[in-house]
Amino acid sequence: MKRVFLVTFLVLVSTFLLGATKEIVFWHSYSTTSGEYELLTKDIIPTFEKSHPGIKVTEVQVPSDEMRRRLIVSTAAAQYPDVMRMDIIWVPQFADIGVLMPVDKEFAQDFAKLKGTFLPGPLSTNYWKGNYYGLPLDTNTRVLLWNKKLFQAAGLKQPPTTMDEFIKDIKLLTKDTNKDGQIDQWGFADNGFGPWNTIPWIYSFGGKILDDTNSKALGYVNSAQSVEALKTFKDLYQQGYMAPIGGGGIGTLEGYAEGVYAMIFEGPWAWSIIKGQYPDAEINFALVPAGKGGSKSVVGGEDIVLFKSTKYKAEAWEFAKYMTSKEVQLKFAGIGQMPVLKGLLNEPVIKNHPFFGIYLQQLETAVARSPHPAWNEINDIMDSAWQNSVVGGIDPKKALDDAAAQIEKVLKNYK
């Protein structure tokens, strides 16, 4: 009789505990063949569930090229995951339509404690109209890659640290090495005219795209500093000191590795791509040269967001916090994902890494691509303005005046 009672009791307890478990669904785009996916599914989630026995995390992998379509379908059906790893550009877009949870409002005390632990650039990508709609999860930026052999051949010992030195070195390192009358070595190369490429120029020169509230372009995108950045870039390009962009030539990473380009701006993925094709290539990193605005670069990456529709907001928040914890951030750093927390430069996994240190240092001052729901439109306007000036010959001030007017029209829809 006692045995029957005990078995019945255990069944009831198990049923109760099973019923009490709260399932949260986490969308992400980590490739199922990646180290990040293996870490997430075999370590991060199981460890979280073990320390939070009442929570079950169901991860759903959505390929990155399908994610936006899935989100749009979810919007139409009003069916969202609880938590998502979201591209930083999308956060203000989905915050603006009211589907994301303002975490600084819902979890005010927790957020106040966490806010100061994040790198400012990645954190800013979650901000829209007075609230934060997520936490930074992983990040990246662009730094200067310089070819030491080409520098030494030109009598230069160190990479440039200022914009003046940068411009001087670009000119010095552009050469016709085989004396056939054609330039075959360029001081600098890049692969586009959009803000991802040009923000290091604009902001290091002291310019901006939008004001601090992301509601005004006039006087910022066409400020004297922004115009100077475009004019400098245009002059270098038209005078032949920068490699042609979009002309079907050698790619920036290949050109850097092969000694065709002395300097490029590139992200942390450059290491694996270059080493994969050129195992013996020497790669040297430095901060973006500082101008009147300091050493500034652009922020990339993903945030972790909660949807308002979640039934388990407290549990979803616990998982989001866990994903941004020092423990988890360092685990991901160990397989190549850039962390978002301050104060990690002396951690062994960072200190002993060939390039994380310089990227984290750059991220201390890196700026987001103006967090705004209409960023894609703003991006295209800026891309066209720079391209029309650099390649098309339009005066830099006119190009940016026109861009400012176009962006102002876009911004009016969000005031």
Language model features with spans:
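Conserved N-terminal structural module of periplasmic/extracytoplasmic solute-binding proteins
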Residues: 18-99, 108-115, 158, 245-246, ...
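Hydrophobic residues within well-ordered alpha-helices
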Residues: 71, 166, 173, 202, ...
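Paired acidic/hydrophobic, glycine-rich loop segments that form the ligand-binding mouth/hinge
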Residues: 82-85, 262-266
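Periplasmic solute-binding protein
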Residues: 91-99, 104, 119-158, 190-215, ...
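Short, solvent-exposed loop/beta-turn-alpha elements that line the ligand-binding surface or hinge
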Residues: 104-118, 178-188, 207-228, 276-277, ...
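C-terminal lobe and pocket-closing loops
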Residues: 108, 269-280, 291-384, 414
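Glycine-centered hinge/linker elements that transmit conformational signals in sensory
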Residues: 169-174, 215-245, 288
